Amino acid sequence: MRFALMTEPQQGLTYAELLDLARAAESAGLEAFFRSDHSGSFAGPPDGPTTDAWATLAGLARDTTTIRIGSLVSPVTYRIPGSFAKVVATVDEMSGGRVEVGLGAGWNEPEHRQLGIPFPPLRERYDRLEETLAIVHGLWTEPDGWGYDGEHWQLSDAHLRPPATFSGRRHPHLILGGDGGPRLARLVATYADEFNRGSATPARAREAFGRVAEACKAIGRDPESVVLSAMVGVLVAETEAELLDRVRLQREFFGEGGADADAWLAERRDRWIMGTPDAAQARIEALAAAGVQRIMLQDFLPRDLEMVALLGRLAAG
């Protein structure tokens, strides 16, 4: 099993706090550090700082040394595909080839409205996702002069300068996430290096992985060439007493302090890695049995660096 830390900087993190978290993950031995790509502050206080994903990833490219970095996921509604391809290639070069990129159709309508970004219906957002995937792949892998004629974007005589090298890879490690429905499964099979199933039980993750495998077979791709991962909420502690303290802090941050603690825990126990190390290890084993090869540990206590160190010890076995 491989492990990455997934963070939610829209919870009000400054760049300095994000860097502390990334360096803690690097010191803990986790293989990758991902951040969300949002423009509004949630959950928690609505007026906290919300840093730009790719601006901060450029900073992390220079301020970390070994850990892989990336977005999970960047909505295609936020950026023009050609410009996005160049941003990713630039940050990858800055990092020495450590960038991974997750792409998605976008879902948070209020964020779009607040910044004047169009938020089309779901079908059109998926159309734009598919065109974006075709364009960024083309810019990263096709020779100069390549063109693309889509409904939403057209390119002619395309070239990317500097040319993308990605440390000898044809393109950066590309992740698509979701529930693995038929259209998404087809896009994973066509374009992605990794499929990420978010917030699911092991049984539901296994079902989604099966749909991706069938989509790969349908186009003649080896299903084993797709990394299978899961994004899983995490809340762990060395002792039950410490765990309850972290539960209290998290509930207070989310404004759920008045909710029943037992009910709060019960609602998450079948989807999260939660508890003391023994309980957490059992959950990891259940995910592995479902076919998960990499876990994105979704951290909702981003200022608790001691928990990150504990996650590193769990990852090391």
Please provide the spans of the model-predicted regions:
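Active-site-adjacent structural elements that line small-molecule/cofactor binding pockets in enzymes
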Residues: 1-317
